[in-house]
């Protein structure tokens, strides 16, 4: 996702790959101190796999998913997780290939595939260099604490943020990412069980059924 001001959009493919489960907390690390002692944004890992829980105000639901994130090649794979029996709920796999400008949506049960253009540019899951440092604190209790830093796109003390990212201080892993619009949280994503690297790069290769993909996005519901 290209260099830009740290304002992230909550729509289109960006919202989709976070929605596939399922970037609004984010794990990040402690940056080096600046000339005035203020922490600087750290460099988040560019290739990792983990899990996420996405909350969207529009649906009022939490969506869980497995995530493979490849920032080097600008691609993301999201695999819906079933944690409860929800009547008429379809589970999907999402493969977003930003260099090719396309997203594949694959129904897990039937392998039915949809091929949808990506109209937004790549927006990496990281802390933009012009972000504002908000706070540093520990998550958890004694003997189980993890130090994190909180960043936002707030420009002055009198302005309000539209994006907040939380990253671990040690290795800059994403913990949470939050988007706000009109003083209301519209999307929030938590990241956990993060492991560095991509175990199987083939997860970014669409199945053969996508050779005859339909052009419209599939609904996650079903007809009764």
Curated annotation (Swiss-Prot):
One MF term in GO for this entry? ganglioside GM1 binding
What InterPro entries does this protein map onto? Ependymin
UniProt note on tissues of expression: Detected in brain, small intestine and in soleus, extensor digitorum longus and white gastrocnemius (at protein level). Detected in brain and skeletal muscle, and at lower leavels in heart.
Q: Which Pfam families does the UniProt record give?
A: Ependymin
Q: Which residues are glycosylated?
A: 130, 182
Q: Which GO terms describe its cellular component?
A: extracellular region; lysosomal lumen; lysosome
Q: Which UniProt keywords apply?
A: Disulfide bond, Glycoprotein, Lipid-binding, Lysosome, Secreted, Signal
**Where does this protein reside within or beyond the cell?**
Lysosome lumen; Secreted
- Signal peptide span per the entry? 1-37
Biological process according to GO: cell-matrix adhesion; myofibroblast contraction
State the disulfide connectivity: 42-172, 88-222, 113-210
Q: How is it modified after translation?
A: N-glycosylated; the glycan contains mannose-6-phosphate moieties.
Principal localization reads: other
Q: Which residues form a coiled coil?
A: none
Q: What does this protein do?
A: Binds anionic lipids and gangliosides at acidic pH.
PANTHER family to which the protein is assigned, alphabetical:
MAMMALIAN EPENDYMIN-RELATED PROTEIN 1 (PTHR10697:SF1)
Description of how the protein assembles with itself and partners: Homodimer.
Q: Provide the family line.
A: Belongs to the ependymin family.
**Protein name per its UniProtKB record:** Mammalian ependymin-related protein 1
> Which species is this UniProt entry from?
Mus musculus
